[in-house]
């Protein structure tokens, strides 16, 4: 099985909250697609609660688009990581990490402005696969955590696992 890019970085050295360019690729038509690792939690030390991350998924996608789309950037998708320590964001364009960090913080401020659970987009049986698994208060706790900390930049070069370590791990 091929080694995925996300598993070539040392999760024991990742900072959070932090932005990292996880991957950049070009389409056959010349568009650049950038995948960002938006790390909310320190891997293996913190985890977002399932209801909170699910609610955040519904809110974050729209709020990030409000703050980041434009000037050569269009978000394709924002999805939670299975480990519940962050989100992956795929987009067309190449915004720098600071622009992404600023949009992220603005989106978290928007999450705190949501007053009622019924204001969560697509929160119904028709548009959500587990519409009863939500918590606005947990999502707002996550947002508060981000806003109370500096959003840093994680560098692939600094986090790269050495080849000998990858071999030791049988990868």
Swiss-Prot record:
Pfam families: LuxS
Catalytic activity as recorded in UniProt: S-(5-deoxy-D-ribos-5-yl)-L-homocysteine = (S)-4,5-dihydroxypentane-2,3-dione + L-homocysteine
Entry annotated with the keyword Metal-binding: yes
UniProt cofactor note: Binds 1 Fe cation per subunit.
Top-level EC class as recorded in UniProt: lyase
GO molecular function: iron ion binding; S-ribosylhomocysteine lyase activity
Entry EC no(s): 4.4.1.21
Domain of life of the native organism: Bacteria
Cofactor: Fe cation
Residues binding Fe cation: 54, 58, 128
Signal peptide (from-to): none
Keywords attached to this entry: Autoinducer synthesis, Iron, Lyase, Metal-binding, Quorum sensing
Presence of keyword Cytoplasm: no
GO biological process, one term: quorum sensing
Family statement drawn from the similarity comment of this UniProt entry: Belongs to the LuxS family.
Function, as annotated: Involved in the synthesis of autoinducer 2 (AI-2) which is secreted by bacteria and is used to communicate both the cell density and the metabolic potential of the environment. The regulation of gene expression in response to changes in cell density is called quorum sensing. Catalyzes the transformation of S-ribosylhomocysteine (RHC) to homocysteine (HC) and 4,5-dihydroxy-2,3-pentadione (DPD).
PANTHER family for this protein: S-RIBOSYLHOMOCYSTEINE LYASE
Subunit field text: Homodimer.
Protein name: S-ribosylhomocysteine lyase
Organism field: Citrobacter koseri (strain ATCC BAA-895 / CDC 4225-83 / SGSC4696)
């Amino acid at each position: 099985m091929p080694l995925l890019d996300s598993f070539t970085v040392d999760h024991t050295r990742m900072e959070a909250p932090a932005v990292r360019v996880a991957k950049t690729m070009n389409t056959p038509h010349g568009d650049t697609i950038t995948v960002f690792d938006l790390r909310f939690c320190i891997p293996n030390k913190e985890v977002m609660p399932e209801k909170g991350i699910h609610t955040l998924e519904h809110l974050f996608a729209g709020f990030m688009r409000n703050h980041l789309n434009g000037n050569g950037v269009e978000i394709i998708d924002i999805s939670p990581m299975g480990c519940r320590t962050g989100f992956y964001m795929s987009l067309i364009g190449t915004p720098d990490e600071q622009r992404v960090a600023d949009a992220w913080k603005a989106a978290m401020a928007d999450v705190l402005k949501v007053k009622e659970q019924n204001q969560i987009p697509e929160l119904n049986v028709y548009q959500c696969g587990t519409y009863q698994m939500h918590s606005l208060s947990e999502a707002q706790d996550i947002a508060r955590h981000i806003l109370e900390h500096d959003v840093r930049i994680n560098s692939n070069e600094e986090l790269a696992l050495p080849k000998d370590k990858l071999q030791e791990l049988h990868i």
